[in-house]
């Protein structure tokens, strides 16, 4: 794995290399998180840094902030959202951060073989490696940026998730794994998802993981 930081504010990012398809690596992720959060509390830091708590960290809020503050969080949330309609599961009543039903790769996830015209063999997985290439999208959302760079021109025009590199990659992943039905790869919906990709290769250059949607299309 790797560590990097915003040195000026003392914010560390922990990036272990783990395969979230494997139960053993999911257990490692939780162990790493618990140990890291214990260190954060020991040194009086914040487990979210400049980020929100979200699904990944809300589970630990009561331990981090104490029961009194956790009760105040609940009071505020209940005052503004008594029916739990707005972004539920954040800050209070959070699921476990390692709940497998929240993962992109749920238990039993698999991809069948699929004939391809291009060589994807530098990536692992089924469909000659296309699976691995598609799964390089880790949902970081850089393709949704609106300032600077090129990626992703179609999303910048429509503002629709399906017209972003991430939206297209997730559609391909769901189709390859059979979650959109047996004919999804050749469906009208797939064609509609891909039609506004202008093959600019901005994603290959600017995506942090180098997702090449023009080639996949």
Name what the model sees in each region:
Residues 1-139, 159-161, 167, 196:
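Conserved glycine-rich FAD pyrophosphate-binding loop
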Residues 103-217:
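Ferredoxin-type iron-sulfur electron-transfer modules in oxidoreductases and energy-metabolism complexes
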């Amino acid at each position: 794995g790797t560590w990097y930081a915003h040195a000026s504010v003392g914010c560390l990012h922990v990036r272990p290399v783990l395969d979230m398809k494997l139960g053993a690596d999911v257990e490692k992720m939780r162990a790493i998180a618990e140990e890291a959060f214990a260190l954060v509390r020991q040194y009086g830091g914040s487990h979210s840094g400049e980020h929100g708590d979200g699904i990944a960290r809300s589970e630990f809020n009561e331990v981090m902030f104490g029961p009194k503050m956790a009760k105040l969080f609940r009071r505020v949330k209940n005052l503004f959202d008594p029916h739990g309609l707005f972004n539920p599961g954040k800050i209070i009543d959070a699921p476990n951060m390692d709940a497998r039903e929240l993962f992109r790769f749920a238990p039993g996830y698999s991809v069948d073989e699929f004939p391809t015209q291009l060589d994807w063999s530098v990536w692992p997985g089924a469909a000659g490696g296309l699976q691995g290439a598609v799964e390089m999208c880790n949902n970081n959302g850089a393709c949704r940026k609106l300032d600077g760079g090129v990626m992703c021109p179609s999303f910048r025009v429509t503002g629709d998730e399906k017209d972003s590199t991430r939206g297209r990659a997730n559609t391909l992943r769901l189709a390859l794994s059979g979650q959109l039905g047996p004919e999804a790869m050749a469906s009208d919906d797939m064609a509609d998802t891909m039609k506004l990709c202008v093959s600019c290769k901005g994603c290959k250059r600017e995506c942090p993981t180098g997702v090449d949607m023009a080639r996949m299309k």
